[in-house]
Curated annotation (Swiss-Prot):
It catalyses: Release of the N-terminal residue from a tripeptide. Zn(2+) 2 binds at residues 140, 174, 379. This is Peptidase T. It is found in: Cytoplasm. Keywords: Aminopeptidase, Cytoplasm, Hydrolase, Metal-binding, Metalloprotease, Protease, Zinc. It comes from the Bacteria. Its cofactor is Zn(2+). The lineage of its organism: Bacteria, Pseudomonadati, Pseudomonadota, Gammaproteobacteria, Enterobacterales. It is an enzyme of class 3 (hydrolase). CDD domains: M20_peptT. InterPro entries: ArgE/DapE_CS, Bact_exopeptidase_dim_dom, Peptidase_M20, Peptidase_M20_dimer, Peptidase_M20B.
């Protein structure tokens, strides 16, 4: 474990923030730097079949050290950090033996407070790695990368029995492109785990069904003084549309297994307005109902408009709930839960109120639930990770490999 923290600090020093709306994959040059570094490290460790695709997917194999027909399994993390917050010049703070209370982030006004983040009350005595209040930390998902790399080293150094272990590091997960160019056949694993979760013990195999809704509103602009019966204000139509969306089904009003409608952006003038929503729901029928609801709202608001004025709505599915694919292979979850218990961790099965590469990979034929990393408050200045949690994640990865080798 001695190199776990060193690896993590090394990885977060590289700015790998991804960028939405970019055609190329990876979307940023910084991701290539980390991918090339990891490729070099994997080769130095003696892994075989180390490949880096033109779309930035890095794969490698730790060969089995025991004979027999042991299923090849995989571990996957992503190299990019969220576009929501800067990942440049990350300056981590290490708080040893946390004793409670506020933690000053750098020399500014930002603090990490248990008043806002009550989970801190449960972390007394542990080592926290925080930001300096100016950037995100990058534990999502460089904690996962450091944990996988350290687990590979532990498996090698301690000669722990295992089958073929496949690892992959992907780009652009945060902008929804991480799995689109993933070659499942080349990866050649029976199943895999993304290491991209949160607090210790989290095991996730359910995620949102997700869709995006883009609404284009075309109005008619004339001088306000002579507008009666002629002007069609696109902004007013946009306001009417949003007023029809259930206010109590927004992200800030929902939790657990509850779905939502989220107005992510809105811009415009009298003549033209654009709205972007995302729709999320765990239940497939409710998911489809939410999409129908948006179409009904657009029809209702657009009824009776002049032919030159219109509301155009485009709905595009993003990903689906991987639960239906993972539950077909219950041993995948059984092994992960047993591994956690063997490491004195009580598994906490909870839904992902978001998505992971694993969701898309599960529908591409690679069942892929999500393991914890020990990180919290992703995508912002209050992000932090627990060193002891990272160490536990390494132990669980190693134990999963060991338990799989026993399932001959």
């Amino acid at each position: 474990m001695d190199k776990l923290l060193e690896r993590f600090l090394n990885y977060v020093s590289l700015d790998t923030q991804s960028k939405a709306g970019v055609r190329q994959v990876p979307s940023t040059e910084g991701q290539w730097k980390l991918l090339h570094l990891l490729k070099e490290q994997l080769e130095e460790m003696g892994l075989i079949n180390v490949t880096l695709s033109e779309k930035g997917t890095l794969m490698a194999t730790l060969p089995a050290n025991v004979p027999g027909d042991i299923p090849a399994i995989g571990f996957i993390s992503h190299v990019d950090t969220s576009p929501d917050c800067s990942g440049k010049n990350v300056n981590p703070q290490i708080v040893e033996n946390y004793r409670g209370g506020d933690i000053a982030l750098g020399i500014g006004d930002e603090v990490l407070s248990p008043v806002m983040f009550p989970v801190l009350h449960q972390l007394l005595g542990q080592t926290l790695i925080t930001t300096d209040g100016k950037t995100l930390l990058g534990a999502d998902d460089k904690a996962g990368i450091a944990e996988i790399m350290t687990a590979l080293a532990v498996l090698q150094q301690k000669n722990i029995p295992h089958g073929d272990i496949r690892v992959a590091f992907t780009p652009d997960e945060e902008v929804g492109k991480g799995a689109k160019h993933f070659d499942v056949d080349a990866f050649d694993a029976r199943w895999a785990y993304t290491v991209d979760g949160g607090g210790v013990g989290e095991l996730e195999f359910e995620n949102f069904n997700a869709a995006s809704v883009n609404i284009k509103i075309v109005g008619n602009n004339v001088h306000p003084g002579t507008a009666k019966g002629v002007m069609v204000n696109a902004l007013s139509l946009a306001a009417r549309i949003h007023a029809e969306v259930p206010a109590d089904e927004s992200p800030e009003m929902t939790e657990g297994y509850e779905g939502f409608y989220h107005l992510a952006s809105m811009k415009g003038t009298v003549e033209r307005a654009d709205m972007h929503y995302i729709i999320r729901d765990f239940d497939r029928k409710q998911f489809e109902a939410r999409k129908r609801k948006m179409m009904e709202i657009a029809k209702k608001v657009g009824k009776g408009l002049h032919p030159d004025c219109y509301i155009e709505l485009v709905i595009e599915d993003s990903y689906y709930n991987m639960r239906e694919k993972v539950v077909e292979h219950p041993h995948i979850l059984d092994i992960a839960q047993q591994a956690m218990r063997d490491c004195d961790i009580e598994p906490e099965l909870k839904p992902i109120r978001g998505g992971t590469d694993g969701a898309q990979l599960s529908f591409m034929g690679l069942p892929c639930p999500n393991l914890f990393t020990g990180g919290y408050n992703y995508h912002g200045k209050h992000e932090f990770v627990i060193l002891e949690g990272m160490e536990k994640a390494v132990q669980v990865i190693v134990r999963i490999a060991e338990l799989t080798a026993q399932r001959k």
